[in-house]
Amino acid sequence: PEGMVGYEALIAATPPMADECGQDDELCGIYYTGGTTGHPKGVMLSHKNFIAASINWIATLHFSDQTRYMHSAGLFHLAGASPAFALTLAGGTHVCLPKFDAVLAFEAIQTHRVNYVLFVPTMINMMLNHPDFERYDLSSVRYCEYGASPIPDAVLAAAIAKLPSWEFIQGYGMTETAALTVSLPWRFHFDGEHGPHKRQAAGRAAYGVDVKIVDPDGRELPRGTPGEIAVRGAQVMLGYWNKPEATAAAIRDGWMHTGDGAWMDEDGFIYIVDRVKDMIISGGENIYSREVENAVHAHPAVRECAVIGVPDEKWGEAVMAVVALKAGQAVTEQELIAHCRT
């Protein structure tokens, strides 16, 4: 037709161009992470890493073209970037917050009928304790993935009670594995045909990922024995940018050594106890901060709690809890200590 250019004529008049699309082990992006060490390292992730991670999200976490996902994490972070790739592959809808704020989250969920969210435990706690929580309709949400830090038992119990339409899914991962590696589905948060609930667990290995617990020499440990989480699969990073020694220390014999201490039960569920380097050793005894944090957080006056080890002449290390109270609440140090002993 007049004024139109044919496809064949267009191709014939254009010189060939090299395919610039990245693939397989070609570098896709560098994401900086300090983990809990405080020293940023550039994690090199390939196109294959992101494709594998996206398939994992779709297979493990129910992403589909019906998903309306709210991004509460920055896209510079793998907690934001990894689901962004996966949701695009699935054909879902992106709802992006400019920053996390409880009211912004409430409004976005209500306005856009968001049905999938990802929050760190602190965000969940902030929402539950916000004075305007009851004013918003949050019932459109079906799935809430949570992770990045341990969630206190009291916070999870409150979330389940106050948000009955939400199905909570625990997710564990790291930048070096393109995010999700272990997942705890909703059904395992309760007793059922599978047996007693596994709410204390991070979950089992996600789709396409191998996970084991190893000793410092990389030998796999028996079930129930604490060690370090090691991960293998197509999601594992290429390495750290310009840090060959750090890469060699982290990836050994094809396994990514995470630095997270955990044990695995007979059913393959992973129970995280602490960062390997952050375990508190007092009088020769291993003390896991999460266990103490759960005990402190069970007190009704406590809003947030973090447990650390501090130098002690007698015991080597002593346990210290840093506590923030709920508005209008009061409790003494002695009362909290007595509570933890009960």
Question: Which residues make up each language-model segment?
Answer:
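Conserved ATP/PPi-binding loop(s) of AMP-dependent carboxylate-activating enzymes
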Residues: 204-208, 219-249, 285-287
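Adenylate-forming
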Residues: 40-43, 53-58, 69, 106-108, ...
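Conserved AMP-binding/adenylation subdomain of ANL enzymes
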Residues: 51-68, 76-116, 130
